[in-house]
UniProtKB/Swiss-Prot annotation:
The lineage of its organism: Bacteria, Pseudomonadati, Pseudomonadota, Alphaproteobacteria, Hyphomicrobiales. The gene is nodD1. The keyword Ion transport does not apply. It comes from Rhizobium tropici. This is Nodulation protein D 1. InterPro entries: LysR-type_TF, LysR_subst-bd, NodD_PBP2, Tscrpt_reg_HTH_LysR, WH-like_DNA-bd_sf, WH_DNA-bd_sf. CDD domains: PBP2_NodD. Pfam families: HTH_1, LysR_substrate. One of its GO terms (molecular function) is DNA binding. Residues 6-63 form the HTH lysR-type domain. Residues 23-42 bind DNA. Keywords: Activator, DNA-binding, Nodulation, Repressor, Transcription, Transcription regulation. Belongs to the LysR transcriptional regulatory family.
Amino acid sequence: MRFKGLDLNLLVALDALMTERNLTAAARSINLSQPAMSAAVGRLRVYFEDELFTMNGRELVLTPRAKGLVSAVREALLHIQLSIISWEPFDPFQSDRRFRIILSDFLTLVFMEKVVKRRAREAPGVSFEFLPLADDYDELLRRGEVDFIILPDVFMPTGHPRAKLFEERLVCVGCGRNQELSQPLTFDRYMSMGHVAAKFGNSRRPSIEEWYLLEHGFKRRIEVVVQGFSMILPVLSNTNRIATVPLRLAQHFAEVLPLRIMDLPLPLPPFTEAVQWPALQNSDPASLWMRGILLQEASRLALPSAEH
């Protein structure tokens, strides 16, 4: 099929080449022979009047013209796939769909475990790929490279549909033997104690508690920075440091670690964990099914009370 002189099949080849950055891998990903893929490269170069790729060993290096085409080609193919080609009926029990989800380790531990267990009963062939919080999740959503992101709603990009999952609140945690926590925590002591904080992604994006504190004009004395929530609580062991974490995460670790959980001595509001998906997948039957599972499991969560 041609559109204004361009064989649309070549866009599939171009997308594979720009994704894989390797001729052999790109050919394999779309079930073409290597000679056929080489021929496609030649035709693409003629059409776009640009080399598009140069070789660096076995790696294909994109020219500036090719870099400018990456998003446009991916979005065009995604739109054709999701909006023009008819949806196939989705049978969870028969499906082998893999869902790619960006979320924090906190959510993996306290929420997705329940979703995974339910999947085993209702959709044994369905699988998940949980991805760490990235710096470019907005772009990944736009290109349809992930199925969902699950984040505090204050961090979510615009332009894609979303739904509320559950509310969470922040608490202070420390080692159970931390004598500084043997009495109610005052604001002055909270601010003066050494803190452990989490950052995410290559740009060291702050976690929700850091964002809230900065929004309210509070700056803690951070002694240790770790990648992800799950590394915070083990680092508190046998120290006088404290951390500010989601309550459900604190209670999850309190089952196996000697932790003390305390209310924060400052007025930070609860926050909302939400799920967001690509706009072009809004009517995808598989995405609709998965959204239903997420919302149903979230509705079963009650906001627990902090233990003192």
